[in-house]
């Protein structure tokens, strides 16, 4: 699927992009020929182009923007707050600067992408690439120059960081609280007052286990 700002783009160019929507090596962060073709078209049109790639290596969609922006849509193949979307985004910067912008990082976080990559393009050729992953409340980034130097091993970061998120989610799951009710009394009415404390604990939703009840008598 090709979407976005396709106005004025020749049919042959759209067909070339359409033909890129297929399966690639899942162990490659981005196929080199795919990247070269997208960079060439991005440079020729002076428009940002965005490519969505699944973990299986399939290009799911390609979006076209203008010289400075491209619309990002949500493509999520996985569910759960402790999971990433299962989709990574590689997009071009036809100004020749492959550094990720604040807007790029915001989209990475909002869409919970596997990764966000920006590729600098100068006269149809790639210059550099920056890749970012979600890590906790922040990001982990890698910079490559030239762009073709991008190490496919960074794909392992996706599963590693996602595993860290899952472990963190498990450790922060709400655990029912337990109350130890202790009443210090001087007038012998401890049992009545402890019953009142138990009622308050019940109102708060705390689980109770009744066994022996000990009263601490103040002198």
Show the residue positions of the predicted features.
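N-terminal accessory targeting/assembly segments
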Residues: 1-219
